[in-house]
Curated annotation (Swiss-Prot):
Record's function text: Catalyzes both the decarboxylative condensation of pimeloyl-[acyl-carrier protein] and L-alanine to produce 8-amino-7-oxononanoate (AON), [acyl-carrier protein], and carbon dioxide, and the transformation of pimelate into pimeloyl-CoA with concomitant hydrolysis of ATP to AMP.
Signal peptide: none
Family from the record: In the N-terminal section; belongs to the BioW family. In the C-terminal section; belongs to the class-II pyridoxal-phosphate-dependent aminotransferase family. BioF subfamily.
Keyword vocabulary terms for this entry: ATP-binding, Biotin biosynthesis, Ligase, Magnesium, Multifunctional enzyme, Nucleotide-binding, Pyridoxal phosphate, Transferase
PANTHER family the record matches: 8-AMINO-7-OXONONANOATE SYNTHASE, CLASS II AMINOTRANSFERASE/8-AMINO-7-OXONONANOATE SYNTHASE
SUBUNIT field: Homodimer.
Catalytic activity: heptanedioate + ATP + CoA = 6-carboxyhexanoyl-CoA + AMP + diphosphate; 6-carboxyhexanoyl-[ACP] + L-alanine + H(+) = (8S)-8-amino-7-oxononanoate + holo-[ACP] + CO2
Keyword Chloroplast: no
Residues noted as binding pyridoxal 5'-phosphate in the record, renumbered to the chain: G365, Y366, S436, D461, D462, A463, H464, T492, A493, S494, K495
Stretches of the chain forming a coiled coil according to its record: none
EC number(s) on file: 6.2.1.14, 2.3.1.47
Protein name in the entry: Biotin biosynthesis bifunctional protein BioWF
Amino acid sequence: MLSQNPTTVAWWSVRMRATGTLDDEPYHVSGAESLVAPGMIEQTVAGLTQRALAPGHTVKARQVRVSLDQLDVEPTIIPALPTELKECPDPVAARQYFVDVLSRFVPHPAEALRVLTEGPTMRGAAMVEAGTDRRLEADPLRGVRVTKFGDLTESAPGASLAHKKHHHEAVLLASKVAAAPGVLAEFCISDDPHYTRGYVCVDGVYTTVTNVKADGDPNGGRVILVDTARADPTTITTWLENHPVLIGPATASSQKATSWHGHLCGRLNAWRAAGLERRPRTFCSAQDPDAVTTDGPALLFSSSDYLGLSTEPKVQQAMNNTVRRLGSSSGGSRLTTGTSVAHHQAEHEIAAWLGYPQAVFMASGYQANIATIQLLADPHVTVISDAENHASLIDGCRLARARTVVVPHADLDAIDTALDCVTTDRALVLTEGVYSMGGDVAPVGELVEIAHRHGALVVVDDAHGIGTVGPTGRGATEELPASQRPDVLLGTASKALGVEGGFACVDETLATLMRNCARGYVFSSAPSPVVAAGVAAAVEYLRTDTRRVCSLQANVAQARLLLAEADLIPPSAAHDRGPIIRIPVGPESRAVAAQEELARRGLMVGAIRYPAVARGDAILRICLTARHTDEHIRILVTSLREVLDGALSDAPR
């Protein structure tokens, strides 16, 4: 271990490059670098020279150059990354692991992997922009070099450098890369034909991956994923190539608790660097258009209280009466003490209103979706799932371990083709009624006909359609004949109904099965009877009074027309009926900048980013309500046009 204070030593960079010839062309044989104190220069030069001339290289060195450069700035001292091991049985499994990790950052992970395995040989690394797959290095044949780094823990660098230590040297290099501004992750496959390991550096942890290639394979490379909103490519390159760094011992390699902390901090930092961090806004008022938060007044265009029923006196009175009569808690699951007369009333009202024999009421729409799909699907079921389905539907498929086929959004031909190819015992088609990110209405009737022709079950999640579309607000299926209605209709009470909870509308057989076997129903505490009473009152209100539904639909039509005229949405979206309006923005950083500028103008609009939408396809998500006025909508359209045209013209793209 060095005894000198590293911040008071005049450090030197000692670099070695050895070249030979192969097929009459120059060939790189070996290269290494170390930062050393003056007293260690001689032994370092000797060690690097010994490495260059050592037998075993593919090509014999014909020229060895050793250069010495005194640093003009003090090196930064950082700890080495904690290390882990990912054992893979073969290159196929190892490369799938690379693809799985890459998919967190780039839309086409297989393309990024090809840079590692099939790209032209270069001594540096490829710099790839997260979210776009765009290559950023100035010279793709040279790549980005990582230089001017050394090992602060090495007591005899000359002897150490005489023989290459792949793992140790890779950890040092990766530690410097991970500390660079804007870097999210690094991936490496060694180009040494006889070194069959690679590494992934992400979330502040260096993971060695075994069997990334066959012995004798000379191909390899490195990819550094960066966030250009955090640092531009020139800044990142300059830091990697010129900023001196000394790497000390890992602070967490042998302490599990510290390792966990570092791992979690790394994940959080990577999430932040990708522009994905969110913070909740705290409300001091109800979800009215003219809302009040702890940051001040806000014109609200991001609430799902579409009809304003959360402040409807009849709903509130029903809840007040119930809390006095039945208490504030259910006290248990639905099969123990958690079912009250209020729960039965809510289920009866929902089923009668939406035209199904039974409704099964649960604590949230998310829970109802997962519980229903987990019950229906299993490894013997193929689920045909729309590409824009909500996370709760996706999670339900994962928990069920069903074979899931994702089809393009609202593509009936793709659904038909997928059903033709089903080889499992049963099939299930899964879609939303009104899509939660775009507000478009699914072609449910035609979809049901196709699915039933193949003997498949149809499940429709109409969380954003119930209460908002249809002549009387009964959702995307209201006008369909019985032959075109889905087998299972999922919904929520937390949006248009203005309360809480979720439900599945089903037949008698499935209702009984769910009440006995659906895990989200059996093993979760029941929603409060107060909530159930509010849901029953909200449904009863809508059965007898549709004026709020009409007001909402008029606002949606007006807003879509004005937004299309302002070129903020495509003409095709002007005629969609859903209360959610998708404003395409692009990069996450631009969506956040737009959201912040709108907030400064007093408007609260959601910036929807990965993982709710694809990386690089962020949107502003407008939610209309029955209580918005013509003036509110005019302010919205004008502000959006000004912000997206003017205030963000210089925002990162």
